[in-house]
Amino acid sequence: EEKLLIYISYDLQKFSSSAIEKMFSSATEAKNSGYKIIGLTASSTEERNSFIKNNNLFFEFYTCDETALKTVVRSNPGVIVLNRGTVKQKKHYNDFSDLNFN
């Protein structure tokens, strides 16, 4: 994938409302800049589907092992920006607004 934004949350129930707002805003900006957006979580299918529906998200979350997700990013949630498989940015949820999609 040329431009990929991955939100990582090993536990979707620990997503704060302010983090959700920051995620939605940065995801919208990324989408408008041509990025494919996905999420990775260790949460159950029911929790995932509920989270997507309740927050009007326009991208999917996929399942991954919790330990693997914690290895990738320690914050819950966190985000990684990839360009052709190369990590360009890795941020804590407090810094979602600092993401650069150029």
Labelled PLM ranges:
Residues Y10, A42, R84:
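Cofactor-binding loop segments of dinucleotide-utilizing enzymes, especially the Rossmann-like FAD-
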Residues P77-K91:
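A short, hydrophobic beta-strand/beta-hairpin element that forms part of a small beta-sheet core
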Residues N94-N102:
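A short, polar/charged loop-to-alpha-helix boundary motif
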Residues I37-A42, N54-N76:
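Short, internal strand/loop/helix patches
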Residues E1-K14:
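Short active-site neighborhood of thiol/selenol oxidoreductases, capturing the structured segment around
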Residues S17-F51:
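Structural microenvironment flanking redox-active thiols in thiol-disulfide oxidoreductases
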Residues L12-S17, F58:
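Short, flexible loop segments at the rims of nucleotide/cofactor-binding pockets, characterized by
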Residues L5-Y7, I37-G39, V81:
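Structural beta-sheet core signal
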